């Protein structure tokens, strides 16, 4: 098939229409999932089994099953229960957008909870004990000691989860949502040129994730002053402790 720059350009422009929906799914699912994940992480680090066990089971279930299966269960499966069809949740569960958003949020919460749990457990126990010895209240302890250090530790892993969620929005096309991949599938059925269409779609996802990765890199740079590269080369005198003005 001959190379057609005009077709690529027209395809690229057509796929841009799916970016707003993809971003809405990614941003809102990450926001909801983060709130749920923080609650799950606190339950996981709790010493009470009746808090730890439900969180552990939730994380196991959603990490151990494919996201596509979860989307299908929520969109196609829940509608077979008469109680749900007559409940206040039905106006949301009958809409593909809310089903996709819910599945994405529940899925990312399971992964993010483990990332947050690792960040919380990475805080040195000595600092926590010292803060308690100084009479620091639990809320203040979390706000000034635990949370700032936990955020720094979990940020690299959390940035990877955000990138994965941006790509996972493509699965929303399986339940009729016309985001980037949904529009791409429609164009392929009309043009029978899957290579060019999916190449354009992949370029859009790559650009979106590049921007997201750069934003997280900027946040990491601002949170780790000691990791910033100095503009002036460090010479031998500096290493010996001499100060140059």
Swiss-Prot record:
| UniProt entry keywords in alphabetical sequence | Cell inner membrane, Cell membrane, Membrane, Transmembrane, Transmembrane helix, Transport
Where exactly are the transmembrane stretches of this chain? 12-32, 57-77, 96-116, 163-183, 199-219
What the record says about family reads:
Belongs to the binding-protein-dependent transport system permease family. HisMQ subfamily.
Name the gene that codes for it: occM
Q: Which GO terms describe its molecular function?
A: transmembrane transporter activity
Gene3D superfamilies given for it?
Answer: MetI-like (1.10.3720.10)
What membrane topology term does the record carry? Answer: Multi-pass membrane protein
Its localization reads:
Cell inner membrane
- Ranges for domain ABC transmembrane type-1 come to 19-216
State one Pfam family annotation. BPD_transp_1
Q: Which superkingdom heads the taxonomic lineage of this protein's source?
A: Bacteria
Q: What does this protein do?
A: Component of the octopine active transport system probably consisting of four subunits: Q, M, P and T.
Q: Name one GO cellular component term.
A: ATP-binding cassette (ABC) transporter complex
**Any one GO biological process:** amino acid transport
Q: What is its main location?
A: membrane
> PANTHER family recorded for this chain?
ARGININE ABC TRANSPORTER PERMEASE PROTEIN ARTM, MEMBRANE COMPONENT OF AMINO ACID ABC TRANSPORTER
Q: Does the keyword Repressor apply?
A: no
What is the official name of this protein in its record? Octopine transport system permease protein OccM
């Amino acid at each position: 098939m001959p190379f057609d720059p005009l077709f690529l350009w027209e395809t690229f422009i057509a796929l841009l229409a799916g970016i707003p929906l993809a971003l809405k799914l990614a941003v809102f699912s990450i926001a909801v999932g983060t709130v749920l994940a923080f609650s799950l992480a606190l339950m996981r680090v709790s010493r009470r089994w009746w808090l730890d066990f439900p969180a552990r089971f939730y994380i196991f279930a959603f990490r151990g099953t494919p996201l596509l299966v979860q989307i299908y269960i929520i969109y196609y499966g829940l509608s077979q229960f008469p109680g749900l069809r007559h409940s206040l949740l039905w106006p949301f569960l009958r809409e593909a957008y809310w089903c996709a958003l819910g599945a994405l949020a529940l899925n990312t919460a399971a992964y993010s909870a483990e990332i947050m749990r690792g960040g919380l457990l990475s805080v040195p126990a000595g600092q926590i004990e010292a803060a308690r010895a100084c009479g620091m209240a639990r809320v203040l302890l979390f706000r000034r000691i635990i949370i700032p250090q936990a955020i720094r530790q979990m940020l690299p892993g959390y940035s990877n989860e955000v990138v994965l969620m941006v790509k996972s929005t493509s699965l929303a096309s399986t339940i009729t949502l016309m985001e980037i991949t949904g529009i791409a599938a429609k164009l392929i059925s009309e043009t029978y040129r899957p290579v060019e269409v999916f190449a354009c779609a992949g370029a859009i996802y790559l650009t979106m994730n590049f921007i997201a990765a750069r934003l997280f890199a900027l946040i990491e740079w601002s949170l780790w002053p000691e990791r910033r590269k100095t503009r002036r080369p460090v010479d031998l005198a500096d290493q010996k402790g001499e100060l140059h003005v």
